[in-house]
Amino acid sequence: MQTVKALRRVSEPLQWVRSVSYGRRFSALPNYSASDADFEDQVLVEGKAKSRAAILNNPSSLNALSAPMVGRLKRLYESWEENPAISFVLMKGSGKTFCSGADVLSLYHSINEGNTEESKLFFENLYKFVYLQGTYLKPNIAIMDGVTMGCGGGISLPGMFRVATDKTVLAHPEVQIGFHPDAGASYYLSRLPGYLGEYLALTGQKLNGVEMIACGLATHYCLNARLPLIEERIGKLLTDDPAVIEDSLAQYGDLVYPDSSSVLHKIELIDKYFGLDTVEEIIEAMENEAANSCNEWCKKTLKQIKEASPLSLKITLQSIREGRFQTLDQCLTHEYRISICGVSKVVSGDFCEGIRARLVDKDFAPKWDPPRLEDVSKDMVDCYFTPASELDDSDSELKLPTAQREPYF
């Protein structure tokens, strides 16, 4: 495995959609009359010289994103982009976590109470914020120190500069709760080397900071203990020049490389199995390998896959495969269709069932519907990718400002 220089830009397999030349618990968003301060406290603002920082500050929920948090982030980033006094922006988390994803417990209760419109509004605003990040006109930095799961990746990986640390843990475990990797995940996972994206999406396998550097998800690596030095240095900058910001981030580099146990050393096996056409073929090939050679990695991987929702596995594989040939806005559009179909229980209630089993009752015995891969039909999967207008004549497609913020492929 090739060694990499921490805090130096790697050659990025992720060609993020942007319009600049440098490569670079749920509720609706209501009026906040009673508790504006509470919502503001969940996303703090820090200003230094010519920069602004958004700090996720919901540590009791591991900085899980609520609807008000997403709304505040979107408003802040929009205003900062328009403010000529601000040269670049930064996002980080308080405590030991960057962002553990969406606040799915509140979503679970909201759906069960029949408030699906709240859920739809959350996803709409979340995906619009991801698109804003991916087309941002100013340099933006994400410091992914600590747990970075689910849409925590979606709100950070579009950034021009993506800093991982020795405390970073990235994972997309959505299939384990009957959902799918979203918030742009079908874009950035599909652009990882080989079929690594399919593997991460179907198993929920974790990556550490060094592995994120090695595969291109992160642009810089920094020891957690050195973050204050980096933040102090970039906080003094008065420029919007990405090259200057790059040099400042690169000041505290170390030589790092994935250790011998890293899953990245199994990329040939990953490509061999996860490059197959269907989930059934992936499982069958790995079962044959495990039986013939007693391959422990195959056994562990099979266990991870078989714990997931069969429907989610098939939806997720198709989502990643389609995302490989789509722009960011197209990925977000098809992810929005999947999410809305999931929370509306049009085909299945696996999302709520997965949350119940893992986070509510904690019996870890979800009753998936359908219960087996062979029971998941093509029509079921296709329903999740069908425009809303073709299902119920509604006009509930995700509307992104592509005319004003046109992406490139």
Swiss-Prot record:
Region of interest: Disordered: 388-409
GO MF term (any one): 3-hydroxyisobutyryl-CoA hydrolase activity
EC number(s) given by UniProt: 3.1.2.-
Enzyme class per UniProt: hydrolase
Organism: Arabidopsis thaliana (Mouse-ear cress)
Organelle transit peptide: 1-26
UniProtKB keywords: Hydrolase, Mitochondrion, Ribonucleoprotein, Ribosomal protein, Transit peptide
InterPro entries reported in the protein's UniProt record: ClpP/crotonase-like_dom_sf, ECH_dom, HIBYL-CoA-H
Cellular location(s): Mitochondrion
Subunit-level organization: Component of the mitochondrial ribosome small subunit.
Family designation: Belongs to the enoyl-CoA hydratase/isomerase family. Mitochondrion-specific ribosomal protein mS47 subfamily.
Protein name: Small ribosomal subunit protein mS47
Gene Ontology cellular-component annotations: mitochondrion; ribonucleoprotein complex; ribosome
